[in-house]
Amino acid sequence: MENSDRYNIFLIGNNPQEISTMESNLSKYHRMDFIADVGFDLRDSLSKVFKQKPNYILLDDCYPLIQVRRFIQRIRNNRQTEEIPIALLKSSNRHVRIDGIQDFFLKDNFSADRLFHGIKNSRKIRRTQIVLYRLNKKRRRQYQNLKYSIKNLFSG
C-alpha cells in the first residue's frame, strides 16, 4: 500500500443513500484511514479525478455502459491517472466485461475489509498491466523497425 495511513477513495454513483452508506462504512474501518470523496455525475467526476488523483476509484454500475467505458478510457489515456485502480460496484452477479476494471464488488457484500484487500490486489494488477502494455508496445515498435529494415535490405 502507501507509506501513509490515509488512502483516498473516489466513490462514484447516482444514489446518494448508497454512497453515503459506503462512505460511513469506510470511515469506521480500523485497519486503514479511508478518505472518501464522492461524485454523482461521470463528467464532473472525471475532472475531479484529474485534479485530485485519488488512490482508488470505486464506480457504481448504474451508469450506461458506453459512458462507463468512455470514463475509464479517459482515465487510462492520461499519463497522470493511468495507474489508478478502478473497481466496479455491481448490483448483480451478472458478468460484464469492461476493459480497465481491476476488481468487482457486489453491493450486497460490500465491506471496508473487502475493499482493503481488493485495493491491495488491484494495485498490483494495475501496475502489472501497465508494464506488460508498455513492453508489448515497445516490442511491436521493434518488430515494425525490423520488418522495415528487412524489406529495405531485400528491395534495394
Question: What are the functions of these language-model segments?
Answer:
Residues 37-38, 85-90:
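Short, hydrophobic beta-strand segments that form beta-sheet elements in well-ordered domains
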Residues 101, 112-127:
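Receiver (REC) domain switch/output surface
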Residues 70, 89-109, 113:
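Alpha4 helix (beta4-alpha4-beta5 surface) of REC/receiver domains from two-component response regulators
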Residues 4, 12-37:
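Two-component/phosphorelay signaling modules centered on CheY-like receiver
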Residues 19-20, 41-45, 50-77, 90-92:
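Conserved phosphotransfer microenvironments
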Residues 124, 130-156:
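C-terminal output/effector regions of signal-responsive regulators
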Residues 32, 53-55, 79-85:
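His-Asp phosphorelay/catalytic-motif detector in bacterial-type signaling
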Residues 7:
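Nucleotide donor/acceptor-binding cores
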